[in-house]
Regions:
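RecA-like P-loop NTPase motor core
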Residues: 122-153
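Conserved glycine(s) of the Walker
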Residues: 33-35
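Sensor-1/coupling segment of RecA-like P-loop NTPase cores
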Residues: 99-128
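Conserved P-loop NTPase "ATPase switch" module shared by AAA+ and STAND
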Residues: 69-93
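Post-Walker A helix-loop "phosphate-sensing" segment adjacent to the P-loop in P-loop NTPases
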Residues: 44-55
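N-terminal pre-Walker A segment at the start of P-loop NTPase domains
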Residues: 1-16, 135-138, 145
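Post-Walker A alpha-helix
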Residues: 38-40
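Hydrophobic anchor at the beta1->P-loop junction of P-loop NTPases
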Residues: 27
C-alpha cells in the first residue's frame, strides 16, 4: 500500500474514524478507552461479515493473532492488519522481517515500545472521543523549531 488510508468502522454503539499515513501505526492508551473494542469489532466483521452488525469502509481490514500468524500474514496483500496487545509475536525479529517485506499497513495496539520495528513518533496515537464517535489523536506533539526542542544546538 502507498499513501494515506482513511478508515471508518462502526456499529450501533461505536464509530471509529481514522487515517493511516504510514505502514506502521501504533495505538496506545489507558484501559477503557476503546482499543480492544475496536479490535473486537474488526475481528467480528472478519468472522461474521454483515451479520456482526459492523460496517467497515476503507479497504481490506483484518485482525492477526495466534500461532499461525506467519501463514496468515503471507496470504495478505494491500491490507490493513490490526494486531492487539496480547500478541507476543510483535516483539520478534521474524515479525519485523515480515513487516519489512510486505505491502500491508499495520495498526498495532500496544503499550510497549517495539524496538525491532521502525515507526515514526508521528504515527503513535490514542483514541479520543466520548460516546459513540471516536477518532485517533496523535500522542506526541513536538515543535522542532523551538529552543526547548531544538536538538541541533
Amino acid at each position: 500500500m502507498i499513501g494515506r488510508v482513511s478508515i471508518k468502522i462502526s456499529n450501533q454503539r461505536n464509530s471509529y474514524k481514522f487515517t493511516l499515513n504510514r505502514n506502521i501505526t501504533i495505538l496506545r492508551g489507558d484501559s477503557g478507552t476503546g482499543k480492544t473494542t475496536l479490535y473486537d469489532m474488526i475481528r467480528d466483521y472478519n468472522n461474521l461479515g454483515r451479520e456482526s452488525g459492523v460496517k467497515i469502509s476503507g479497504g481490506n481490514i483484518v485482525t492477526l493473532e495466534g500461532r499461525n500468524w506467519e501463514d496468515e500474514l503471507d496470504k495478505l496483500s494491500n491490507s490493513v492488519v490490526v494486531i492487539d496487545e496480547g500478541s507476543k509475536f510483535v516483539f520478534s525479529k521474524e515479525f519485523a522481517s515480515k513487516v519489512k517485506g510486505c505491502d500491508n499497513y499495520f495498526l498495532i495496539i500496544t503499550r510497549s515500545y517495539l524496538s525491532q520495528l521502525q515507526y515514526s513518533v508521528d504515527e503513535i496515537y490514542s483514541i479520543k472521543g466520548t460516546g459513540k464517535n471516536k477518532e485517533f489523536k496523535r500522542k506526541h506533539h513536538h515543535n522542532w523549531g523551538s529552543r526547548k526542542y531544538n536538538y541541533w544546538r
